Amino acid sequence: GDVDVLKSLSADQKAAIKSSWAAFAADITGNGSNVLVQFFKDYPGDQSYFKKFDGKKPDELKGDAQLATHASQVFGSLNNMIDSMDDPDKMVGLLCKNASDHIPRGVRQQQYKELFSTLMNYMQSLPGANVAGDTKAAWDKALNAMANIIDAEQKRL
């Protein structure tokens, strides 16, 4: 299953993910805010899941304190998952908690996959992240497994 996919990430793949993530995490709130604004542009329907931001134009949210707070929470959570890659059981626990927390908001696997897609596009253009080739493949493998674990947990609940 997808837990096995996470466990099958090689040391090199995990190192590549962590190294590229470090460029993002250096300004997690700024980069995270940029990703959320772009996410709302890429997937306008998904903005309605965020009641605080529903009905606002994405560009109006640049510099918004609530957006910055939410970005630090969303990407802080992802940061914790990446930090726990060497402990797949802990990572799965974090994913399952995140999956459960998002059920009442109607957020499902599709929205996670869409956010991950925007994140990867952003990281590919982020200086120092070097998300290409084997690093991009490692990210794709990890994020796909994460989205599937979230989906399985939401269906189980």
Curated annotation (Swiss-Prot):
Describe the subunit structure.
Monomer.
What are the residue boundaries of the Globin domain, all occurrences included? 8-155
Task: Provide the family line.
Answer: Belongs to the globin family.
Q: What is this protein called?
A: Globin
Which SUPFAM superfamilies has this protein been placed in? Globin-like (SSF46458)
Does the record bear Oxidoreductase in its keywords? no
Record-linked InterPro entries: Erythrocruorin, Globin, Globin-like_sf, Globin/Proto, Mb-like_M
The record's GO CC annotations read: extracellular region; hemoglobin complex
**At what positions is N-acetylglycine found?**
1
The chain's coiled-coil residues are: none
Please provide the record's keywords in A-Z order: Acetylation, Heme, Iron, Metal-binding, Muscle protein, Oxygen transport, Transport
Residues binding heme b: 70, 102
Disulfide connectivity for this sequence is none
GO MF, one annotated term: oxygen binding
